[in-house]
């Protein structure tokens, strides 16, 4: 799912490796994307592309199996973090515009951040984040449904080879 959704978006980083070989860190496999050039800034569309790609694994489960598993937990966490930063730190919120609603609390250790807003604003932030996640999820589902045959071909090839790298894609 990740590789196909990435490939169908014009500004996604190219996929360099896909594997279904489990790793000791708990990953059941992964899709590796490497940027073609070093990038220091991400546009709003770049961030949405990344979120769509992160949500594509769960979306593929829904399209293929009609169900959900816990396998996408880290992807969902990362997508939610990006969406939250869009709203609270990057000024990319429809509702709040260019307001800095969060600050980095410990930039030298874990990089966690805290909200600088009223409680009702925090609830509104959650709604904005949910909206971004829902739209990106729907976009990923649409791509996978449209290209279902290709999704099945990639999955079949992966089951046979276990790992696909650059030239094979």
State the predicted function of each range:
Residues 3-169:
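Soluble catalytic regions of large protease machineries
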């Amino acid at each position: 799912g990740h590789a196909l959704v990435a490939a169908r978006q014009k500004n996604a980083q190219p996929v360099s490796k896909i594997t279904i070989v489990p790793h000791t860190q708990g990953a059941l496999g992964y899709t590796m994307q490497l940027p073609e050039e070093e990038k220091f800034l991400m546009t709003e569309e770049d961030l949405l592309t990344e979120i769509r790609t992160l949500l594509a694994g769960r979306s593929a489960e829904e399209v293929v199996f009609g169900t959900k598993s816990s396998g996408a937990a880290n992807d969902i966490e990362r997508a939610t973090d990006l969406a939250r930063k869009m709203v609270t730190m990057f000024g990319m919120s429809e509702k709040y515009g260019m307001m800095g609603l969060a600050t980095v609390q410990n930039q030298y250790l874990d990089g966690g951040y805290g909200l600088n807003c009223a409680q009702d604003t925090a609830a509104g932030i959650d709604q904005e984040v949910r909206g971004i996640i829902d739209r990106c999820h729907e976009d990923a589902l649409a791509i996978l449904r449209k290209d279902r045959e290709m999704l099945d071909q990639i999955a079949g090839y992966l089951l046979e080879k276990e790992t696909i790298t650059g030239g094979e894609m």
